[in-house]
Amino acid sequence: MTPDHTLDEFLDLVDENDNVVGKKKRSEVYAEHLSNFRVVNAFVVNSKGEIWIPRRAANKRIFPLCLDMSMGGHVESGENYEDTLKRETQEELNIDTDKAQVRLLGHLSPQKDGVSANMNVYEIKMD
């Protein structure tokens, strides 16, 4: 994260085809229970096929102490999924995605899949 980064960044709002149609602060998106924004999630998998699944911190507002994806983050306004994957993987895991094997597993949407946001899910292979 950059030093001036806040938890109230702007997120792009998207239509049912994942095209940007506007933007709102993250706090407004959650206060209004919107699902038309973008996120990325990734699973780190080693050469044995083992997945690293961390436990969320006790002080997390949503799902404290629950098991989670290896990495997850919001796509900030002006970013695309790949930019966010690179930024969040560096911030959360100190992994440079340019030096890892990354594969898109799929795209999920609130309309088709019942998830909380438009979501790209990735696999990051490394030991």
List the model feature ranges, each with a label.
Residues 2-41, 45-47:
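Acidic, metal-coordinating catalytic segment for phosphate/diphosphate chemistry
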Residues 13-15, 32, 65, 69, ...:
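Generic structural "secondary-structure junction" signal
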Residues 38, 58, 90-127:
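Active-site segment of metal-dependent pyrophosphate-handling enzymes
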